[in-house]
């Protein structure tokens, strides 16, 4: 999806930066306090290109991987809002709630809210949510006058960023504008800028011709080279 490659509008970026800046104080105040009131909005979206998603068998079930975050309900004043493409079987939810130490299933359910898009299509969950203003309104209503809240996502792209701005929530994750620095090329650039030793090599190679040239240049600079990792 090409939209995932486009930067957010300036106003959206500014709002997102404002939300993220406030998250630092929120994290320090409530994250490690088991008795602090807080709400976690879980968006378990596998946000990838639709063509790639269509090739992942049972991609919609990947949304169940973040059900481990239901363990947050062991903190008696923590609320969880969990959004999915399709409803999750109640038996699966019961299984997780029965794993909670020292908390009854009834007590946990009072602080757990599930909502679904009822949509099995091959677009990401986050895009499905963004296309449903009424669902966003329902989430906002649950959050209204509630404790401090943030979003927890499987991966963070411009779509999650847009949803965070729509909901007025910070994300426990990396700003998509900084994702490049987490790539192998970005990491090598940082190491070089900081004079950190890193294996000889090249970054930002885009095609087969670039790979061949990089390998040839590596060999020229080190005649004893026997192996290289692409």
Where are these regions (language model features)?
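Active-site nucleotide/adenylate-binding loops and adjacent lid/helix of ATP-dependent enzymes
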Residues: 175-230
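ATP-binding N-terminal substructure of ATP-dependent carboxylate-amine bond-forming enzymes
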Residues: 1-189, 209-211
């Amino acid at each position: 999806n090409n939209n995932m490659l486009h930067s957010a509008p300036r106003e959206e970026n500014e709002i997102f930066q404002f939300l993220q800046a406030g998250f630092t104080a929120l994290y320090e105040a409530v994250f490690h306090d088991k008795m602090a009131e807080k709400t976690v909005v879980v968006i378990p979206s596998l946000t990838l290109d639709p063509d790639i998603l269509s090739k992942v068998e049972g991609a919609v079930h990947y949304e169940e991987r973040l059900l481990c975050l239901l363990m947050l309900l062991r903190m008696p004043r923590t609320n969880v809002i969990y959004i999915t493409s399709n409803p999750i079987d109640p038996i699966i939810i019961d299984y997780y709630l029965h794993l909670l130490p020292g908390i009854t299933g009834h007590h946990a359910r009072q602080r757990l809210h599930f909502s679904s898009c009822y949509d099995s299509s091959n677009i990401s969950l986050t895009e499905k949510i963004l296309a449903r203003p009424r669902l966003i309104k329902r989430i906002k209503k649950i959050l209204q006058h509630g404790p401090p809240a943030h979003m927890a996502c499987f991966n963070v792209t411009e779509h999650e960023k847009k949803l965070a701005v729509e909901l007025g929530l910070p994300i426990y994750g990396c700003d998509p504008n900084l994702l490049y620095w987490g790539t192998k090329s970005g990491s090598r650039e940082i190491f070089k800028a900081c004079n950190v030793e890193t294996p000889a090599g090249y970054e930002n190679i885009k095609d087969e011709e670039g790979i061949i040239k990089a390998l040839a240049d590596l060999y020229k600079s080190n005649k004893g080279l026997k192996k290289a990792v692409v």
